[in-house]
């Protein structure tokens, strides 16, 4: 089933630790059957790209039997490293996180675009291995598990590795290795962006690497042309030859994927004379619905023998040639064809395809939360835990949110911490997965002072966000819209850009808040009665939250957020539900 017209309520899902009644099971079965009939009337084996919409960059994939597992970078969001499962490569259900215990992951003080970079996942002799880099705090590490659902071990640090993007390779002769992006020879760069790919022996039992380091690639495909940022390496053995793939060009418009080949795992590695094997940098930036910045790929082979690639890419909004996007770097899928002994990604098309056929029969009725195409997801907070797609800013160190204090509601304690600081504020977010869409909440909150605020954020980083909230002024309830002040490191680094007093009787009543994404603008709306919306402010600059303006490596998130702006508070905000809807223009042109 391709989830193109998918609406799902979390109260209809089976969650771990929560038993379903037969009536609920029957209802879910009928709902899924109806969805399958609707979807299959349109297509039997097609799927939408990106397969993971929103900021899910640096994908790595492995197959175990008929099951596929995929992980992505999560930077300074917690839990760390989301892990997804699929049976058909096209439809992915998040099954958890690799680093989901505070003792595994210390993100305190790290900026949003620091933290966890470029995980790589592999399976070997009954064990799942995942390598990753925690930038600025700890460096490179490996964790293991007997089950992708977890629990995963605590990180085993690899201090010998000087670099980022570690990737394990298990050879068929019993030897194991970790390769990674590292410093130039003698740490003397010939130009800005000069990096290398290096490798060490890896003991899969002790989880230690050898002291001997091998240099596999210096600079990139052709060092005379000053290639930059060779990174994200992986090795595969196919028909007796070793293939090393890596990203080159930097993770922006010049991004690409290149390949090298050797008869020996230790090299020498010879570059393909028709590199790159994946890029979009040569295409007209004014083309309709471009996918840009493609690279950082990983490969997987199906049981039937076909090869596929997952990789990151970006989707700018109109006008396309300006290169603005707020959804971050997303995960795409494309077929791999072998030509003259070399793997070529997306060989039948110049442009990355938004819709394509998959060789594996699409698994209908999986029941998971959709991650591709157009969809609506509504969380009514009736489960005993948050769903996996929710995320926090950095590692929680105290209990500040709950699902049991008020039945069917998510409660957030107002605390002094704010999203403009490198701390863990009262922030529960989910990714913006569409260029056009909305996020809506129903909020119950009675502010006790002017500095108490609760509502919904659209957040890119500590310096770039908009905050639509309920608060008070002079004891009267008010709806306010704030914009962050870039470069201001104070607790309240935001300026008021719109406000509207509420009816005095609404001070203790519910208020509905909505943020609508409209490509290069956002609109902010509120209501005190269902479906009777008032526009607080429209045409708000969305490029302020774009990667091009805000910088960094992440995309925007919608978040439920409550703060007392540096002052003590004993107040609580309660969210009755949160609804996300996405309907990009590209999906309307079927």
Predicted feature descriptions by range:
Residues 24-25, 538:
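Hydrophobic alpha-helical segments, especially transmembrane helices
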Residues 17-18, 40-590:
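Carbohydrate-active catalytic/glycan-binding domains of CAZyme proteins
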Residues 4-21:
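Short, Lys/Arg-enriched N-terminal segments with co-localized hydrophobic residues
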Residues 28-36:
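Bacterial N-terminal signal peptides
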């Amino acid at each position: 089933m391709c989830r193109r017209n998918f609406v799902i309520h979390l109260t209809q899902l089976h969650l771990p630790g929560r038993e379903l009644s037969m009536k609920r099971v029957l209802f879910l079965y009928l709902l899924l059957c109806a969805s399958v009939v609707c979807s299959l009337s349109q297509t039997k084996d097609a799927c939408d790209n990106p397969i993971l919409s929103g900021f899910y960059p640096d994908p790595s994939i492995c197959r175990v039997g008929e099951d596929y597992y995929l992980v992505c970078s999560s930077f300074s969001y917690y839990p760390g490293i989301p892990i997804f499962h699929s049976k058909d490569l096209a439809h992915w259900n998040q099954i958890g996180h690799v680093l989901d215990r505070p003792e595994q992951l210390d993100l305190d003080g790290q900026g949003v675009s620091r933290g966890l970079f470029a995980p790589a996942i592999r399976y070997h002799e009954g064990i799942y291995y995942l390598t990753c880099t925690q930038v600025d705090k700890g460096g490179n590490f490996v964790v293991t598990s007997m089950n992708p659902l977890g629990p995963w071990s605590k990180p085993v640090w690899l201090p010998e590795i000087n670099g980022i993007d570690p990737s394990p390779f298990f050879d068929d002769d019993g030897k194991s290795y970790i390769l990674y992006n590292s410093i130039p020879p003698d740490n003397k760069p010939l130009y800005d962006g000069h990096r290398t790919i290096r490798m060490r022996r890896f003991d899969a039992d002790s989880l230690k690497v050898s002291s001997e380091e091998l240099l596999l690639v210096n600079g990139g495909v052709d060092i005379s042309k000053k290639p930059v940022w060779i990174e994200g390496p992986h090795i595969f053995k196919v028909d007796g030859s070793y293939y090393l793939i890596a990203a080159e060009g930097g993770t922006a418009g010049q991004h690409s994927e290149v390949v090298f080949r050797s008869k020996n795992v230790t090299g020498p590695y010879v570059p393909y004379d028709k590199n790159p094997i994946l890029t979009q940098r040569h295409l007209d930036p004014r083309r309709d619905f471009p996918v840009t910045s493609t690279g950082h790929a990983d490969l997987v082979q199906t049981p039937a023998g076909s090869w596929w690639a997952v990789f990151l890419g970006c989707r700018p909004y109109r006008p396309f040639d300006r290169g603005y996007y707020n959804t971050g770097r997303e995960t795409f899928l494309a077929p791999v064809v072998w030509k003259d002994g070399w793997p070529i990604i997306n060989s039948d098309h110049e442009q990355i395809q938004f819709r394509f056929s998959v060789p594996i029969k699409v698994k209908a009725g999986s029941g998971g939360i959709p991650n591709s195409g157009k969809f609506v997801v509504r969380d009514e907070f009736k489960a005993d835990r948050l769903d996996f797609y929710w995320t926090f800013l950095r590692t929680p160190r105290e209990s500040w949110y709950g699902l049991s204090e008020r039945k069917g509601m998510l409660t957030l304690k107002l605390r002094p911490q704010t999203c403009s600081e490198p701390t863990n504020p009262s922030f529960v977010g989910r990714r913006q997965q569409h260029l056009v869409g909305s996020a809506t909440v129903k909020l119950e909150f009675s502010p006790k002072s002017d500095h108490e605020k609760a509502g919904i954020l659209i957040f890119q980083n500590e310096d770039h966000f908009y905050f639509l909230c309920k608060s008070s002024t002079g004891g009267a309830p008010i709806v306010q819209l704030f914009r962050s002040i870039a470069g201001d490191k104070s607790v309240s680094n935001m300026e008021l850009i719109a406000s509207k007093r509420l009816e005095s009787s609404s001070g203790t009543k519910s208020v509905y808040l909505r943020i609508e994404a409209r490509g290069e603008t956002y609109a902010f709306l509120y209501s005190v009665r269902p479906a009777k919306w008032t526009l607080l402010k429209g045409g708000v600059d969305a490029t302020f939250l774009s990667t091009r303006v805000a910088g960094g490596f992440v995309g925007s998130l919608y978040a439920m957020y409550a703060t007392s702006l540096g002052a003590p508070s004993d107040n609580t905000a309660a969210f009755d539900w949160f609804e996300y809807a996405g309907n990009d223009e590209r999906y309307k042109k079927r």
